[in-house]
């Protein structure tokens, strides 16, 4: 079985998408066409047009390949990554392999949108971004709390599709096969503490508005965003093939699950065992729990795939700092290298950073903010630190006035303090 794949987009070799081999690298037809457009521009393309790219994804990565892509950037969350990979695979298989179904077969495969439940900074947004990049499809990310019903100050729900259209560079067909990630969906529940007493600006009314686009319909979208008005131009977007992913922390959900199961909060404390038990409880979430939380049944009925993410542990935090392809430590080391300096962290310093992120309850998302705080003065002086190795110690994390170790690199490669 031929397992060669394009070194640029990872598409496997097929009859319709052959590969050109180089020195241990391969490039597919679609990447050659893309490179031609970049190098020679629109004028050359019009004078000597190339064959149009085939619509859609020529090769749909398998669930294992999708999970492998997630593994490169998302630490832990094994069950969530597996569920997510299968759901994304089935979604795009449903779109691009319709021709494999018998014409007489009237079975219609419904769209499976996804709900990700997990603490802040557990990787919900990162998972969506990673697979969108891997599949080369546009993605729009929005915060549900910024959405309001038509007629109130805030964003119309249709503006989500405007963002997707802009991410697709105005290509409607490409946008119609993209991904929309709606974060903090739990904050627009009917039981939200932020809900107005006199009117429902960003609660059930927004859920009803979201329902229309999530379930699949043709929506008039203002290409430049903003509020709709009669004299405005609109673009029609069919949302039936757009994958909608909703995410939220759903604080207090565990108590609802305990109540449904006839239990109580006794025995659950802030220790490690208690945290793991609470994560296990969250995995037992059911649609009825979401209704009790304040999401309308119609919306839950359109989110067929529900999975949960665990709270990030200290061990996972340490891996997040150093292991992924775009690990934060690697990013900051690259910034230092650009100024001909070197950056390293003592193991104790990384542990202190992880512990501080856990203390702040910001998850993996808070790691960058902590490193920014620790390296601020160094970044300010970085142009003067050429040919130095900078070592961040535990003291630098715990005490902002502490100075890092500076080691001068000699020309022969040796270092001196």
Curated annotation (Swiss-Prot):
Any matching Pfam family: ClpB_D2-small
Domain of life: Bacteria
GO biological process terms held by the UniProt record: cell division; proteolysis involved in protein catabolic process
InterPro entries the record matches: AAA+_ATPase, ATP-dep_Clp_protease_ClpX, ATPase_AAA_core, Clp_ATPase_C, Clp_protease_ATP-bd_su_ClpX, ClpX_bact, P-loop_NTPase, Znf_CppX_C4
Domain ClpX-type ZB residue range list: 1-47
Binding site for Zn(2+): 6, 9, 28, 31
Membrane-spanning intervals of the chain: none
Entry keyword set: ATP-binding, Chaperone, Metal-binding, Nucleotide-binding, Zinc
GO cellular component: HslUV protease complex
GO molecular function: ATP binding; ATP hydrolysis activity; ATP-dependent protein folding chaperone; protein dimerization activity; unfolded protein binding; zinc ion binding
Binding annotation for ATP: 119-126
Family per record: Belongs to the ClpX chaperone family.
HAMAP family: ClpX
Subunit record text: Component of the ClpX-ClpP complex. Forms a hexameric ring that, in the presence of ATP, binds to fourteen ClpP subunits assembled into a disk-like structure with a central cavity, resembling the structure of eukaryotic proteasomes.
Function comment: ATP-dependent specificity component of the Clp protease. It directs the protease to specific substrates. Can perform chaperone functions in the absence of ClpP.
Protein name, entry field: ATP-dependent Clp protease ATP-binding subunit ClpX 1
Species, as recorded: Wolinella succinogenes (strain ATCC 29543 / DSM 1740 / CCUG 13145 / JCM 31913 / LMG 7466 / NCTC 11488 / FDC 602W) (Vibrio succinogenes)
